[in-house]
Amino acid sequence: MGAQWKVKHKEAAANAKGRTFGKLSKEIMIAARAGADPDMNSRLRLVVEQAKKASMPRETLERAIKKGAGLLGESVNFERLTYEGFAPHRVPVIVECLTDNINRTVSEIRVLFRKGQLGAAGSVSWDFLYQGMIEAVPAAADADPELAAIEAGAQDFESAEEGATLFLTESTDMDAVCKALPEFGFTVQSAQLGYRPKSTVDGLTEEQMAEVEAFLEAIDNHDDVQNVYVGLAG
């Protein structure tokens, strides 16, 4: 599993679609503070690519951009919070939040972590890499992911779902690699900064795995949670 946790069960995944749009809308609004034109705002461009991949309705996407850029006369005040700790059975977890009420979020996340263990800053992040993660698909049959990774400046690459390739970059290089990949036969579908575990917990029983997944799903269901990263094998 390692890296970003995703809902596994079909019914839960279907119900998560609306939450995904809500999370992306927050990211779009924050990015759009620096300008509403994705061509002039690299951070906004990358989030818009994620939103399109998730099939966010165009009207929702455009409204989020306008709201974030202040074109609708509404202010956007979100703060970023990051929590570290452990799920049941000492599985390391990093949780990223965007909130308009820090006190509420802190209190509610503490409650959710009662079935695990909330740690201090640095308690588990030392065992994760903060990287750019670019998902791209070949635009031509002869596109070579290894060559593309080398030439575009990615650190590494690995196979992703549905024939895509995941290119891994230094956090500061992600935008440059995104721009370079099309030259080497790859179309970028999404790009984001996030955490990847250096090592993962394995050997859990079916019952233990169910406890971990229930914990992660409860965390991910919280309205202020944007991303959940976990060091879990499988």
Curated annotation (Swiss-Prot):
GO CC annotation terms, alphabetical: cytoplasm
Keyword Transcription regulation: yes
UniProt GO MF annotations: DNA binding
SUPFAM superfamilies noted in UniProt: YebC-like (SSF75625)
Keywords: Cytoplasm, DNA-binding, Transcription, Transcription regulation
InterPro entries named among the record's database cross-references: Integrase-like_N, TACO1_YebC-like_2nd/3rd_dom, TACO1_YebC_N, Transcrip_reg_TACO1-like, Transcrip_reg_TACO1-like_dom3, YebC-like
Major localisation: cytoplasm
Gene3D superfamilies (UniProt xref): 1.10.10.200, 3.30.70.980
GO biological process: regulation of DNA-templated transcription
Subcellular compartments: Cytoplasm
The UniProt record lists the keyword DNA-binding: yes
Coiled coil: none
Membrane-spanning ranges: none
Pfam families the record matches: TACO1_YebC_N (PF20772), Transcrip_reg (PF01709)
PANTHER family for the chain: TRANSLATIONAL ACTIVATOR OF CYTOCHROME C OXIDASE 1 (PTHR12532:SF0)
Family: Belongs to the TACO1 family.
Name of the protein in its database record: Probable transcriptional regulatory protein PSPPH_2212
Species in which this protein is naturally found: Pseudomonas savastanoi pv. phaseolicola (strain 1448A / Race 6) (Pseudomonas syringae pv. phaseolicola (strain 1448A / Race 6))
